[in-house]
Amino acid sequence: MSAKILASTENMAYEDWLEYRKQGIGGSDASVVCGINRYKSPVELWMEKTGQLLAQEAGEAAYWGTQLEALVRAEFTKRTGIEVKIVSQLLQSEEHPFMLANLDGACGYMYIGDFDPLTHI
């Protein structure tokens, strides 16, 4: 599967990032779409994506997940010897444009931006 860069997130304001996320379904939305998320219903997600409901502020787990991203990348590299690169782009599937990805990090054979399209997400 290949993806294109929808937007750079490097210096993007949080509010702008939330607006971009309305354009599709990301990893955090997948469990909601499947009906297995106990915190949000598919109808609530649809209402958020269509601007009929304000997105809820991220909870404690999401906060700590974001805070610990750099630590997890560093520990993975320490244990495996594989470098993890920061990906400061919001990616969109070329085959299924509703699919979005905002990666915490990437390693291996990933080419983004001026190179070949991202492959094998």
What does each model-found stretch correspond to?
Residues T77-P97, D104-A106:
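A short acidic/basic microdomain associated with nuclease active sites
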Residues M1-Q67:
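Charged, glycine-rich intrinsically disordered N-terminal tails and low-complexity linkers that flank
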Residues V72, L103, Y109:
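Active-site-proximal segments of catalytic enzyme domains
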Residues L68, P97-F98:
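Short, glycine/acidic-rich beta->alpha junctions
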Residues E60, L68, L90-L91, C107-Y111:
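Short, flexible loop/turn elements at secondary-structure junctions
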Residues F98-L100, L118:
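Coil-to-beta-strand transition motifs
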Residues A106-I121:
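Active-site beta-strand-loop-beta-strand hairpin of nuclease catalytic cores
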Residues A62-K85:
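Acidic-basic catalytic patches of nuclease active cores, encompassing PD-(D/E)XK
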